[in-house]
């Protein structure tokens, strides 16, 4: 078993174990694999009071309110994720509490990251746009304000000092009433690029969610296209637009987001919902795999040559 990194070798060990379980581990077993996607990340909608938004299986696995982190459980989690090739975890809810960025919580996140690192898993955090205002009394969240930009640079430096391989931020902004760059007459690109500049020295990325809608929109299913298509090519290289598979909200059956195939010069990542918000909560057992497969295999016919959405 060999690979280009310790994580790759770990994936190889799990591949051999799978072959053994399936009765395929014979002497001519020869598997060569390379991940198609660079980032394979779980977003946890865990809150700092240990509740979990749309969580139907108990309280937060990170146990934010406990004195010590649940190290044994986090080791099990890391092994579970690595066994299926996942390499990143966003620890907190996209509807973020600004306190995730205070000194106490950064130290706790660093303890978690120290364990996840053993399994090739990079740690990320969700942030609230108004954090500079809430935590340090800044008067504005304008992404073109030098004071705001410097605040985020300082915060990225502080986090990276505690977590050298910190992955970056996941951002929900100007959606469902939450603040964002549009509150200051700026664009999603202005906001994302400010954060991208802050994490770039440490190799970080910004995952900017395209789940944006407001009651005033005349066509909610197309609002992401209306807000992002004109910004194609304006985002920094380390910004990825995170797009839900459906244009409304993870509905069991709905068309796929019209934003796929509309961004030719901007990296995209697809967001699926594993928790059963629309599929029976904790009352039913539903297999999601075929839904994901259907979405990834769809051909985008409006492009010059039919292209799988996965591409």
Task: Give the predicted meaning of each segment.
Residues 301-311:
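Single conserved hydrophobic/aromatic residue that forms the stacking wall/gate
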Residues 95-107, 177-180, 186, 213-220, ...:
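Acidic-and-aromatic substrate-binding clefts and catalytic sites of carbohydrate-active enzymes
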Residues 147-239:
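Active-site neighborhood of glycoside hydrolase catalytic domains
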Residues 70, 74, 106-109, 148-153, ...:
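Well-ordered, non-membrane alpha-helical segments in soluble/globular domains
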Residues 204-287:
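Polar, glycine-rich mid-to-C-terminal structural blocks
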Residues 1-170, 200, 273, 278, ...:
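Feature activates predominantly on carbohydrate-active enzymes
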Residues 54-56, 101, 134-140, 181-185, ...:
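Short acidic, glycine/serine/threonine-rich loops at helix termini
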Residues 132-134, 178, 311:
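Conserved protein kinase catalytic core
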């Amino acid at each position: 078993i060999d690979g280009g990194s310790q994580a790759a070798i770990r994936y190889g060990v799990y591949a051999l174990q799978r072959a053994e379980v399936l009765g395929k581990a014979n002497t001519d077993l020869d598997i060569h694999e390379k991940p198609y996607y660079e980032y394979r990340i779980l977003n946890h909608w865990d809150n700092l009071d240990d509740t979990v938004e749309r969580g139907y299986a108990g309280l937060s696995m990170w146990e934010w309110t406990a004195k010590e982190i649940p190290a044994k459980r986090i080791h099990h989690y890391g092994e579970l994720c690595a066994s299926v090739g996942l390499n990143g975890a966003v620890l907190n809810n996209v509807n973020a509490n600004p306190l995730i960025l205070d000194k106490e919580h950064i130290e706790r996140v660093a303890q978690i990251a120290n364990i996840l690192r053993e399994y090739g898993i990079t740690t990320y955090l969700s942030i609230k746009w108004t954090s500079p205002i809430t935590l340090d009394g800044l008067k504005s969240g304008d992404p073109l304000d030098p004071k705001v930009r410097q605040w985020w640079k300082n915060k990225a430096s502080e986090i990276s000092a505690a977590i050298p391989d910190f992955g970056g931020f996941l951002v929900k902004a100007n959606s469902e009433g939450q603040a964002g760059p549009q509150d200051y007459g700026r664009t999603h690109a202005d906001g994302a690029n400010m954060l991208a500049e802050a994490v770039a020295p440490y190799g970080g990325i910004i995952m900017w969610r395209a789940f944006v809608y407001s009651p005033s929109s005349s066509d909610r299913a197309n609002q992401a296209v209306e807000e992002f298509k004109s910004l194609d090519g304006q985002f920094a290289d380390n910004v990825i637009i995170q797009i839900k598979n459906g244009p409304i909200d993870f509905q069991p059956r709905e068309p796929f987001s019209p934003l796929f195939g509309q961004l030719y010069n901007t990296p995209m990542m697809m967001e699926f919902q594993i928790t059963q918000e629309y599929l029976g909560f904790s009352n039913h057992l539903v297999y999601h795999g075929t839904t994901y497969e259907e979405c990834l295999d769809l051909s985008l016919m409006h492009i010059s040559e039919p292209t799988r959405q996965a591409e």
